[in-house]
Curated annotation (Swiss-Prot):
Residues 3-54 form the F-box domain. SUPFAM superfamilies: F-box domain (SSF81383). The lineage of its organism: Eukaryota, Viridiplantae, Streptophyta, Embryophyta, Tracheophyta. This is Putative F-box protein At1g70960. InterPro entries: F-box-assoc_dom_typ3, F-box-assoc_interact_dom, F-box-like_dom_sf, F-box_dom. PROSITE patterns: FBOX. NCBIfam families: F_box_assoc_1.
Length: 369
């Protein structure tokens, strides 16, 4: 029998083996061998590793933890494989990315998340416990700021869209700026670029990134509810008309391949719960309204307040609480075709009372390694 070392294996076999290694061990491997480090940092390996990770997507919990006296805001990241039963924690990543509490966290894209604090934005890879701070945006004190996160597949770069606006004493809008930041795989510093938008609007909902386009609910300058789309590659805005008035309680999701709006207001009726969803037909451009009634709701969630958080894949609706009170944690999935409501208990979560943001279909990535 011939002894074969890792170093003597063909490069494609080395990549195949490394693509199955957990992120925390990849970091150690990079310190052992310059050759391994070169492979792990490569673009080809990054795509292979992402592909393997997509086979077992995770639920990501971003916990806005605050300690008082003195105030020490921190972000805790927990992740679990979203189809295992029970959901077993793969560990906790702890990062202090801000001196102030989190304001906004965008959906994970290719293993990265974009976080906004007061006047500060960072892009981080929770699996690696690494982050990159973006240049400070100069805004007047108290001026609102909304951030959205996307990926340009053609140029292999991430982009952050930031919208700031000022108001006068009567709360009417005075001015608005649209800024874009581009982040590639290298560590070269970039800067915010001012772009133009011909459709004056104010963001209302959180965003959805799908197929190279950012979508978010907004109010036009005449107060009408619309969905704005932003092509991450061309950096062009367009308006999608709506037939319903929206508020921050509405959430945009990818539902069976189409973009959909779902009302996230708590509205339980006895033991059931009913949601209103508007699904856009990509061919006709029309919005179709559907009502989703979930039976046995209260019995599954133990009477707790759960909110719609997104979809698993593209068809199962996922629900989780906004706040945990040091008790048994779990998430719920609802299949709109089979009408099956599933509960997944989360084992190993530390008991604590914190505000929690829950994201689904998160994957591990070697970006920022």
């Amino acid at each position: 029998m011939v002894n074969t070392s890792f170093e003597t294996l063909p490069r494609h076999m080395q990549m195949e083996i490394l693509s199955r290694v957990p992120l925390k061990f990849l970091m150690k491997f990079m310190c052992v061998s310059k050759k391994w480090a070169s492979i792990i940092r490569g673009e080809e390996f990054r795509e292979d590793y992402l592909f393997q990770s997509m086979k077992r997507p995770r639920v990501l919990f971003v916990i806005d933890h605050r300690e008082y006296l003195p105030i020490k805001p921190e972000a805790f990241f927990h992740s679990v494989y979203q189809e295992d039963q029970p959901l077993l924690l793969s560990g906790k990543q702890r990062m202090r990315t801000f001196e102030t509490p989190l304001v906004q966290v965008f959906q994970p894209i290719r293993g990265l998340i974009c976080q906004q604090g007061y006047g500060k934005i960072v892009i981080c890879n929770p699996g690696l416990k690494k982050f990159r701070s973006l240049p400070q945006i100069k805004v007047h004190k108290g001026a609102p700021m909304r951030t959205f996160f996307g990926y340009d597949e053609d140029k292999d770069v991430f982009k952050v869209l930031c919208i700031t606006w000022l108001r006068n004493g009567k709360r009417s809008e005075v001015s608005k700026e649209y800024l874009v930041y581009t982040m590639g795989s290298d560590e070269e510093s970039s800067s915010w670029r001012l772009i133009t938008c011909e459709h004056d609007h104010a963001p209302v909902t959180e965003g959805l990134f799908k197929g190279g386009v950012l979508y978010y609910g907004a109010k036009s300058n005449n107060g009408k509810s619309v969905v704005m789309s932003f092509n991450v590659n061309s950096e062009d805005f367009s308006v999608i008309e709506l037939e319903v008035e929206i508020s921050p309680y509405w959430r945009l999701v990818n539902y069976k391949g189409d973009i959909a709006l779902m009302n996230n207001i708590e509205d339980s009726l006895y033991h059931s719960r009913e949601f209103e969803m508007w699904v856009r037909n990509e061919v006709t451009g029309n919005w179709d309204r559907t009502s989703i009634k979930i039976s046995h709701w209260n019995g599954t969630v133990d009477g707790k307040t759960f909110y719609f958080k997104g979809t698993i894949g593209t068809k199962e609706l996922a629900f989780a609480p906004d706040y945990w009170f040091g008790e048994q944690h779990f998430v719920s999935y609802y299949d709109t075709e089979t009408k099956n409501l599933r509960r997944f208990d989360i084992e190993g979560m530390v008991d604590q009372d914190d505000f929690v943001r829950t994201f689904f279909d998160h994957v591990d990535s070697t970006w920022l390694i």
